[in-house]
Amino acid sequence: MWEMANIREQCSWVHSNKEEATKKALALIRGAIGKVKHHKPIGTIEIHVNRNILVVGAGIAGMHASLELADKGFHVYLVEKEASIGGNMTRLGRTFPTDDCSMCTVSPIMNKVNSHPNIELLTLSEVVETSGRPGDYKVVVEIRPRYVNPDKCTGCGLCTEKCPISIPSKYNLGLDKTKAIHIPFDSCVPNIAVIESDVCLKLTKN
């Protein structure tokens, strides 16, 4: 049981007459003591807590958060809307203030995330619905298809060479071209090709 007599804001800070402020403070204390006599103990309750954790966004911050949690034994679902993790840091050449190679910094982190037994990667995915309560949320995640079998793709890039359709590169923000089926970028994670379904001849014709 607890009750606060706020003698700082209501006495000390607002009155210049110390004697009268002291009388008021004593009255507030007596009132708080009298009130707490009528309080009922809150007690304690136990609630179920889901120890699985969802991290939305697999940029540098999301990856670090996932690794910290996974290393502490939590199972982490890492949701990323793009085909690869890494975020905008994978697009940078150098990083301030150390002028380090950006990919040299982020690539080991990406691989560590991908190989961590407590992290489940969900790429091409977005959260579409949440429900539940603190400690026990339920989340619906929409996963878009790659149209490539991840168990068979080796990331060799031969499919990209054979594809006849050229499109602006999403990774390079349209500054160059890629193919309708492509590896998002060098050293991407997961290193699996993805097909742009809106321009692929096979998918659009069927």
Regions found by a protein language model. Name each.
Residues 77, 155-162:
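C-type cytochrome heme c attachment motif
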Residues 17:
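C-terminal boundary of histidine-terminating zinc-finger modules
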Residues 112-120:
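A structural motif corresponding to the C-terminal end of an alpha-helix
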Residues 52-78:
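N-terminal Rossmann-like FAD-binding beta1-loop-alpha1 element of flavoenzymes
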Residues 34-51:
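A short, basic/flexible loop-to-alpha-helix module at the beginning of a structural domain
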Residues 59-61, 84, 158:
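Residue-level detector of alpha-helix initiation sites
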Residues 1-7, 40-45, 82-108, 122-152, ...:
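Non-heme iron-sulfur electron-transfer modules
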